[in-house]
Swiss-Prot record:
This enzyme's EC code(s): 2.1.1.-
InterPro entries reported for this sequence: KsgA/Erm, rRNA_Ade_diMease-like_C, rRNA_Ade_Mease_Trfase_CS, rRNA_Ade_methylase_Trfase_N, rRNA_adenine_dimethylase, SAM-dependent_MTases_sf
Chain's role: Specifically dimethylates two adjacent adenosines in the loop of a conserved hairpin near the 3'-end of 16S rRNA in the 30S particle. May play a critical role in biogenesis of 30S subunits.
Family the entry assigns: Belongs to the class I-like SAM-binding methyltransferase superfamily. rRNA adenine N(6)-methyltransferase family. RsmA subfamily.
GO MF annotations in UniProt: RNA binding; rRNA (adenine-N6,N6-)-dimethyltransferase activity
Organism: Methanosphaera stadtmanae (strain ATCC 43021 / DSM 3091 / JCM 11832 / MCB-3)
Protein name: Probable ribosomal RNA small subunit methyltransferase A
This protein's UniProt keywords: Cytoplasm, Methyltransferase, RNA-binding, rRNA processing, S-adenosyl-L-methionine, Transferase
PROSITE patterns in alphabetical order: RRNA_A_DIMETH (PS01131), SAM_RNA_A_N6_MT (PS51689)
Subcellular location as annotated: Cytoplasm
């Protein structure tokens, strides 16, 4: 929003990049986000890290309701004044940490996420039912979200997310699109949840154990991270000595999400 700089200057606000306070100032990029969100007048939109309302205000003009989460009390006061100025009555502000509050019911989530909480807030969102998310991340993080096996970006995040959602990069943003300029490029991701049953704890623990040693063979990685499975190393080594499945001899970064799920099922039968 072109007047973002003016608002910050008016209230003498110095943004803190250590708190991921990088505000979008490129109107073209803002419009791309709004177009892809495809907000309808019967939808409730959740926004995490609302800031001074760059996304909040235009979304509220389209949506039934916007739930805006922002934990900085000074920024919240400015947001409230912007809402009054625009004469909007369908915005609920939650002044709190997004990782510590329960989210009210919502249809879509549209946010310029604070980058330092990208991973935990994404997985928290996926515990709730919703139609679609349009979210901004660091570009490198966005690439890891949708990385394929046997690539440099393939990670625990790639696998854990693949069971829960379909993702695609719909736009990239240079540092100049923000104030202050971050040191990295950013990306806008479309995320569509999969309506699967919840991921079981053993599978999540298996992913975590494997990717602590992504360049090692699966069996060795699991043994070295046996604590993640709640098992003693020696006990796990003995149990896995009876397993002959070739997947356990494959390097972790080459395993597909389907193969990792198979490994988890084998572990379930042996632990």
């Amino acid at each position: 929003m072109s007047n973002t700089k003016e608002i910050l200057e008016k209230y003498n606000i110095k943004l803190d990049t250590n708190k991921s306070q990088n505000y979008l100032i490129d109107d073209n990029k803002l419009n791309i986000i709004l177009e892809n969100a495809d907000i309808q007048d019967n939808e409730t939109i959740l926004e995490i890290g609302a800031g001074i309302g760059t996304l909040t205000l235009p979304m509220a003009k389209k949506a039934k309701k916007v739930i805006a989460i922002e934990k900085d009390p000074i920024i919240v006061d400015i947001l409230k004044q912007q809402i009054i100025k625009e004469k909007l009555t369908n915005i609920e502000i939650i002044k709190d940490d997004a990782l510590k509050v329960d989210f009210p019911k919502f249809d879509k989530v549209v946010s310029n996420l604070p980058y330092q909480i990208s991973s935990p807030v994404t997985f928290k969102l996926l515990e709730y039912p919703f139609k679609k998310a349009i979210l901004m991340y660091q570009l490198e993080f966005a690439k890891r979200m949708q990385a394929k096996p046997d690539t440099h970006e393939y990670s625990r995040l790639s696998v854990a997310l693949s069971y829960r959602a379909d993702t695609k990069i719909i736009d990239t943003l240079p540092p100049e699109a923000f104030i202050p300029k971050p040191k990295i490029k950013s990306a806008v991701i479309e995320l569509i949840p999969k309506n699967n049953k919840p991921i079981d704890k053993l599978l999540d623990n298996t992913i975590r154990a494997l990717f602590q040693h992504r360049n090692k063979k699966a069996k060795k990685a699991l043994i070295q991270s046996a604590h993640e499975l709640g098992v003693d190393k020696k006990v796990l080594k003995q149990k896995l000595s009876n397993v002959t499945n070739d997947l356990f001899e494959e390097k972790v970064f080459k395993l597909t999400p389907t193969q990792i799920k198979e490994i988890s099922l084998i572990l379930e039968g042996n632990l």
